[in-house]
Design a protein with these regions (language model features):
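Rossmann-fold NAD(P) dinucleotide-binding segment
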Residues: 62-74, 79-127
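A short alpha/beta connector and helix-capping loop motif
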Residues: 54-62, 85, 125, 143-146
Length: 151
C-alpha cells in the first residue's frame, strides 16, 4: 500500500468503510483498487462479500472497526443511520481513540455532522466532513468528492 500520512504525522495503516450501497460501494471499491488495507461493514454482509473476496476484511461491529482502523469512513443513507452507527453501544464512538479520523460521507445535514463531530473530538479523534456529489456514476469514476473540511 502506498504510504499515506495522518494529520498528526503517523502513517495510515488501514481504512474502515461502513455503508456499501450505491455510492459507498463504488467509493470503497476505489480504495481497494488503490491498494488500501480495507475493512468493511454493511447491514447486509452479502453486499460486503465481493469486497472481502477482493482482500478487504470484515468488521463484526463499528466499534471493532474504530479500534482497528486509522480512518473510519461512513457513507450512510440518512442522519438517523449515521447517528445509530456512531452512537450505538457497539458504535464507532465506543471504539474511537486519540489520533483516529472519522470521515463522514453520508446523506445527512450540517447540524448532524457538527453534532457527531463534536462527539468524535471528545474522544481525541478528528472528524472530517467529506460531502459526495454526482451520485453513483461519478462515484464510480472517483470524481465525486467535494473539498473536505473539518467538522
Amino acid at each position: 500500500m502506498p504510504q499515506r500520512i495522518l494529520p498528526r504525522g503517523q502513517a495510515i495503516q488501514s481504512v474502515g468503510f461502513i455503508g456499501l450501497g450505491n455510492v459507498g460501494g463504488k467509493l470503497a471499491g476505489s480504495l481497494l483498487r488503490n491498494k488500501c488495507q480495507l475493512m468493511v461493514r454493511d447491514l447486509d454482509k452479502t453486499v460486503a462479500q465481493p469486497f472481502i473476496d477482493a482482500s478487504a476484511s470484515w468488521a463484526d461491529s463499528p466499534k471493532i472497526m474504530a479500534e482497528k482502523c486509522d480512518i473510519i469512513i461512513t457513507c450512510l443513507p440518512s442522519p438517523a443511520a449515521s447517528a445509530a452507527v456512531m452512537e450505538a453501544d457497539d458504535g464507532i464512538l465506543a471504539g474511537l481513540s486519540d489520533g483516529k479520523i472519522w470521515a463522514e460521507m453520508s446523506t445527512t445535514d450540517a447540524a448532524e455532522v457538527t453534532r457527531l463531530g463534536a462527539l468524535v473530538k471528545e474522544r481525541g479523534a478528528d472528524p472530517v466532513d467529506c460531502p459526495v456529489s454526482g451520485g453513483c456514476h461519478r462515484a464510480a469514476t472517483e470524481d465525486s468528492l467535494k473539498p473536505n473540511r473539518p467538522c
